[in-house]
């Protein structure tokens, strides 16, 4: 059934391309039509100018050819995979057995892309300028004496305590007030999400941290000190939302199964005390976060999801009757953008939720510093049509937190970059944008010298010291995803720093 499904998908691609050729202008060059046809069948067409020739030639085009069934003796898409995983990949149909493009057209398409691509990306020699961060006081935290840090979970519970998990599956609670660490449990593999709701704790393990088509992720539940496992095995889940969407008194579980070549957004409805029924809401890889919010004022909570692989997009899934959903993509991004996170907040105070996105995931086949990485503000016109109104460039941007951190009535932002330009701007791994004028999108940017002490991977915000203002918490993951200066890499791995708490000094307990 799976093979038939993907053969049908490839047939649809061919039909789409046929009509695009049929409707194209006779004056339009064939190579342009080929690019606009084949490069839009699964996602929006990237700008050829967004990547240099070498990356197109050595990384992108060979993979693109494999996905169109073109065999290349210099490139093996299955290299490094075990036989059993190759079998799983073959069943997906991602790499079709028969070519969907002729050899002549494939040669023409490659030559066109290489001829149009720049030798290198234009560099903006004007660096971001930063002020010294004074509103927040950096407070480094170490959980143990072990050098390096591999934190994969950073959340807060209802008592403002930090919940942390690591690559080894260890889960613990950290009380900032007394610096006490309390173990919660050991779950075998990297922990990526944690939720406490209605007396039940939900713990999500990704399974394979590295890209894989194997499904080995799990959700554990803890109730009355008894740990159980939801029977369904998941494909690299990275985010779990536990929420009573239809307000019937029973929580649903919405799981972002990031996957790899394939993936999905899944809904689990409880059948009995042990079993769940699974429904697929989005059948595409790279789902990284989902938020529940009524987006059309019909009294039903909808789902807003970010997908970050290939067809990078924000989708609103409008809730219908009987927990059915109607999906609408409201934002689409180039497949080379590296979408990483989003937030939903009413930026301009007009009563409609706007979307804040960051893109900068650079641990892929196209590693190079990219001037289009950064944060974007997309304003809602009131009918869930979103338009980009502001862009703040930041190499390798991966997370954003949005709040009125200085309590002056507008929205400020905290940004982290897991893939900054460490050679020239290591301090840009964290940036605080203080909003000076929300109407003109005027911001002052701040950072702190100690920001280079960790490779910031996760970020959260909460009033962790209970003094009335919102603090920012950063966690470090010192794995070398991408090239890093040797001195900096040594600094991370000779240090036992795990967290950096940016304590907001706007309000102190002495003032209360």
Regions inferred by a protein language model and the residue ranges of each:
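Bacterial Sec-dependent N-terminal signal peptides
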Residues: 1-30, 34, 38
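Beta-propeller-forming repeat regions
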Residues: 25-33, 38-512
